[in-house]
Amino acid sequence: KNTFKEINFDSYKKNIEIHLNSYVWIAKSIADQMKKNNISGSIIQLSSMYGLVAQDDNLYKNTNISENMTYGIIKSSTIHFTKQMASYYGKYNIRVNNLVIGGIKGHIKGSKKKQDKIFLKNFNFKVPLKRMGKSQEIPSSVIFLASSASSYITGSNIVIDGGYSII
């Protein structure tokens, strides 16, 4: 973990390399292949509400969870990278947009464990819709961005976070 209380520089660099640099190179490679082959279309990237807002330590009170500064840095970078890509690749009729996803109930990355009950209570109290999102609430936005219905949308963030980022 890389928190403001405790950071391991090697872990920090590894996270940036895996979760930011690979993201950039893969997305750029795809866009370059589309450009080279004269393929127009839509690239849909994924980010997190923590790319828009800082993590709130109050959500983690009385849990074994803590903020992760590296995560926020990476996610805010991916949001801006989407805008940079959209600006450059637009002239090739390649649209680049981002889904900015908030808390989704039921999973902890890389684990079969359920989310901490105290964290869920804290999160649900804060978010305007008073609940976490459901995984089935994401695909319709992907379908929209991939379709011709969004043909004049590029460089945008569709925020799916129950209103968390507005407060």
Model-derived regions, located:
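Substrate-binding pocket helix/loop in short-chain dehydrogenase/reductase
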Residues: 1-16, 57, 67, 110, ...
